[in-house]
From Swiss-Prot:
<dbReference type="GO" id="GO:0004814">
    <property type="term" value="F:arginine-tRNA ligase activity"/>
</dbReference>
<dbReference type="InterPro" id="IPR009080">
    <property type="entry name" value="tRNAsynth_Ia_anticodon-bd"/>
</dbReference>
<comment type="similarity">
    <text>Belongs to the class-I aminoacyl-tRNA synthetase family.</text>
</comment>
<keyword id="KW-0030">Aminoacyl-tRNA synthetase</keyword>
<protein>
    <recommendedName>
        <fullName>Arginine--tRNA ligase</fullName>
        <ecNumber>6.1.1.19</ecNumber>
    </recommendedName>
</protein>
<dbReference type="InterPro" id="IPR001278">
    <property type="entry name" value="Arg-tRNA-ligase"/>
</dbReference>
<comment type="subunit">
    <text>Monomer.</text>
</comment>
<keyword id="KW-0067">ATP-binding</keyword>
<dbReference type="InterPro" id="IPR014729">
    <property type="entry name" value="Rossmann-like_a/b/a_fold"/>
</dbReference>
<feature type="short sequence motif" description="'HIGH' region">
    <location>
        <begin position="123"/>
        <end position="133"/>
    </location>
</feature>
<dbReference type="Pfam" id="PF00750">
    <property type="entry name" value="tRNA-synt_1d"/>
</dbReference>
<dbReference type="Pfam" id="PF05746">
    <property type="entry name" value="DALR_1"/>
</dbReference>
<keyword id="KW-0648">Protein biosynthesis</keyword>
<dbReference type="GO" id="GO:0005737">
    <property type="term" value="C:cytoplasm"/>
</dbReference>
<dbReference type="InterPro" id="IPR001412">
    <property type="entry name" value="aa-tRNA-synth_I_CS"/>
</dbReference>
<dbReference type="GO" id="GO:0005524">
    <property type="term" value="F:ATP binding"/>
</dbReference>
<dbReference type="Pfam" id="PF03485">
    <property type="entry name" value="Arg_tRNA_synt_N"/>
</dbReference>
Amino acid sequence: MNIHAIISDQIHKAMLAAGVPPYYRVQVRPSVKKKFGDYQINGLMATAKQLGVPSYFLAKKVVSFLQLNGIARQIDIAGPGFINIYLDSQWLATKIATAIASPRLGISLIELPQTIVVDYSSPNIAKEMHVGHIRSTIIGDASARILDFIGHKVIRINHIGDWGTHFGMLIAYLQQVEKNIDPEIPLSFLDQLYRQAKDKYDTDPSFAQEARNCVVKLQCGDSFCLKIWQKLVKITINENQKIYNRLNISLSHENIMGESKYNNMLPNIIADLKAKGLAVESAGATVIFLNEFQDKQGNPLGVIIQKKDGAYLYTTTDIACIKYRYEQLKADRIIYYVDSRQHQHLKQIWTIVRKAGYIPQTMQLDHHMFGMIFDKEGKPFKTRVGVNIKLNDLLDEALKRARCLILSKNMDVDPVELEHLAQVISISAIKYAELSKNRTTDYIFNWDDMLSFEGNTAPYILYAYTRIASILKRSNYNKQQILTGSILLEKEHEHLLAVRLLQYHETITTVAHDGRPHILCGYLYNLAVRFSSFYEHCSIINANSDIQRKSRLQLALLTSKTLQHGLSLLGIETVDKM
């Protein structure tokens, strides 16, 4: 049940009835201060100015047509034209009862579901996952879960880097120093081999040429190169899957559609782009010149899609990739979770595929970019010697710190329980610290902040959840007994908690639309804070009557279910006690 949508719809109808043209819109938002009601309507003053009428007069006229009978108990006009809406407690109570009884907490499926490809994580083969992969992996996974929940058909794709120049380096290097690859060797060893191969590639021109030759051989299906490539891929994806499992990321082998998948499409893509006059020969290479992008001299920017040695580029693969996703996967929308440095590359690809007619002009392509992670000194988050921190090492450090945190609060904790709690807290702390930040901004990685039991952190919200579980247990009622009572919202804090609980639907809708999980994190934190205030002012166990006790227990139960559900959409597990 989406309160924001209900009020927005009625406001729009009231504005039309008041003679306001349909292209004028106002903002409906939850009130920050309780003295301004539960919701505020902003923007009428700007509309009135455009229409040349007094803003208070327009607000009064709109309110006269506003049909919120049974929903709002009071509607006020404040100042020159702000509209404050106070929701009816009885109406809220009926909606709370509906939400508690619903497996989906009263949240309906979207009316027009789409097939949405979510492209995220995308590590390179033969390299260990590092902290640079954490934002794409965690944010992309949460967004995929949320889109899935509201009813879209979500196709998760892990577009791994399993093709390209770095394979030429590795294959050429292995031919020289280590012809056989044991399938059981650790990924860390391959990572070392890659760095050695890269050093040789950068300093030895003859080796660099041999590496480029190996790339072409691989792309042409050379059996020796393919055999080595297959072993490298298998070792890497098996190791990466362990990290996904550890982080509770909903990616598996079935979601892998790497760059190599599109290799057979590339010759036809090149031929087609030439036939359509989009691609031309330039200095031996095949290039597409885009008027939409200029070089430093102001000339159309050339995008190379095939080198003069016949090798293809990431650009070529990405063109084929979008074509495949539209034609074969029937995607209505594609969302990319890659960092901001890829933005121009993606815009160029999108321009090419639209010009080529590979996708409709109206197809939605979104780049949900994200910022960087810094250390406390404001430098890129790396090891002391300046290399990227391995993701496994980061998770191990989080686990160690979580164990110490738990023991500092309870030295007598059972060892098995300690390990389980440490696993949950460590993973949730890292994921929540990532998800609670606006993805477009940079942030500072701070262990003390993310493991704190105060503020907008995973430990705080997990503790709030366990606190409610304890209250429900101490009530000596089972769930069925709790639900037999009526819901009463007689006190201010009962009303405020009910409003916040019913704002879950609109929060999920916003997060799904914008791909910004930090909005959901902010909601869950605010809900936990509001419950704490409710619990402080409204006794539950020692309520004045059984009716009041059961009513407040229902509010507690729905808060518990909402916290658990919201965390699950973020890919975070809950615990029953801490």
